[in-house]
Amino acid sequence: DNRLRIGGALDNQGGRLDSRAGNLDLQSGSLDNGAGGVLNSAKGWLTLVTGLFDNSAGVTQAQSLEIRAGQGVRNQQGHLSALGGDNRIVTADFDNQGGGLYASGLLSLDGQRFLNQGAAAGQGGKVGAGRIDFSLAGALANRFGQLESESELHLRAAAIDNSGGSLRALGRSGSTRLVAGGLNNAYGVLESANQDLDLQLGSLANAGGRILHTGNGTFRLDS
């Protein structure tokens, strides 16, 4: 394994930290991997414990990822990917505007806000995983963004804005579950092929939007 411990800031802007064969274990006061920086564990896992993690226009990838960033994650125009396993993130705000967040297995996010919006169609962030499970104390902003799960999609947030965006769960078993104070799906798409679709919402705005359940189980809407 490759281990790096720094009490203060780690500046990897435009640089590379590569582990070609083993794992990569990083701990720092903050980490700046922007401006084309690369954090890569080609055949192993990558763990990161830091304050603010800035991956804007950077690349962070490994077979599996575990990230704890107490002051937030910035991934604008960045790429953050677990190539062969799970991507588990615990943070404050996660800014993925124009960025990509991926996992072959589970993508788990515990945090405050998740910002995945764009100014126009095609400009939002992109999220894709085998399974998605978000638990947010604040809002999930997905205006013109995209969240797509190959199996289940579970989202819990204070509010979800999917106006002009897309939320999709493609698996034929399991469930899609959204729990939020409100869902704005104006001109957006919420599509689930899972057996069950469960929407527990304080309010729902769906003007011009589409909610589609093609599974053979239960479609439940509490609002």
Descriptions of predicted regions:
Residues 1-7, 18-29, 41-51, 61-71, ...:
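Surface-exposed loop/turn motifs in large extracellular/passenger domains
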Residues 13-18, 33-40, 53-61, 75-81, ...:
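Short, T/G/N/S-enriched strand-turn elements that build extracellular solenoid repeat scaffolds
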